[in-house]
Structure formats: structure tokens, C-alpha cells
């Protein structure tokens, strides 16, 4: 009887851990989608190219189908960010430096998607890279790769 109760509690706590991991993964995806969506809004000229590039970034980072990536970006767009600290802290906690650098590269790709880098886009990516603790050299290398120079 005691063993059966222990097994039930173990299953319940294991289920809770699985739900927590799923919730954490969703938080991470929403944080990344939120930053990509903000990147599309920075220059006030949201084009199809920027949206497609942001979707490709989500697909590349998380292996999602295009429709799910678009849905996450749409959901992130409906929730206006009031601070970049919350998504940045979630991303810092859950992604390695290499993965955060890939995110910065994806932000640069969205910035360059319309073939015109706005000064506000440049400032935004640098600010986010700083919040993510991505070193400036890595940020600039990511910029070159996104531009097709590296």
C-alpha cells in the first residue's frame, strides 16, 4: 500500500515536471517570438519579407512548422512588450551563449530583410544583444553573417 502511494506521488510529481518543462519551453518560444515581433515593428515598416524572415528564424531555432511559428509571432504581437528585461531574462536562463548569438543573428536578418537597415533597428539589436549578454564581437559577427558577408 505504501509503495503504491509512493508510486502515485512519483507519477504526479513527474507529470508536474513534464508540464513545467512544456511551460518553460512555451515561455522561451514566446520570449523569442516577442523580440522578433518587436524587431519587425521598430522601423514602423512591417513588410512581408520581415514576417517571412521572423518565421524562418523561429523555424530554425525551434524546428517548428511554419504555421506554428506564425501563430506564435501573432500571439506575441497581440501582447505588447512593456519591457525587454522579462523576455531577455527568460532567454538568458534557458539558452546557451551560442543559441543566444543565433537569436541575435536572426534579429539582424529581420532588420536586413527589407534591404534597408534603419538606425532604430541597429540600436534595437545592439540593446537586445547587450541584455542577452552576447559580446559585442559576437553581435558584429552575427551582423556580418546575416548580411551575407561572413
Predicted feature residues:
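Small-residue-enriched hydrophobic alpha-helices in membranes
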Residues: 1-38, 42-150
Amino acid at each position: 500500500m505504501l509503495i503504491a502511494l509512493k508510486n502515485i506521488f512519483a507519477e504526479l510529481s513527474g507529470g508536474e515536471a513534464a508540464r513545467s518543462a512544456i511551460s518553460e519551453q512555451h515561455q522561451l518560444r514566446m520570449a523569442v517570438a516577442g523580440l522578433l515581433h518587436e524587431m519587425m515593428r521598430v522601423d514602423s515598416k512591417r513588410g512581408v519579407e520581415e514576417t517571412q524572415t521572423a518565421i524562418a528564424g523561429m523555424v530554425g531555432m525551434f524546428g517548428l512548422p511554419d504555421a506554428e511559428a506564425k501563430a506564435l509571432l501573432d500571439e506575441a504581437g497581440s501582447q505588447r512588450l512593456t519591457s525587454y528585461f522579462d523576455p531577455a531574462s527568460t532567454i538568458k536562463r534557458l539558452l546557451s551563449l551560442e543559441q543566444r548569438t543565433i537569436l541575435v543573428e536572426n534579429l539582424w536578418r529581420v532588420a536586413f530583410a527589407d534591404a534597408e537597415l534603419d538606425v532604430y533597428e541597429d540600436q534595437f539589436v545592439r540593446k537586445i544583444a547587450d541584455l542577452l549578454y552576447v559580446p559585442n564581437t559576437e553581435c558584429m559577427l552575427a551582423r556580418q553573417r546575416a548580411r551575407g558577408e561572413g
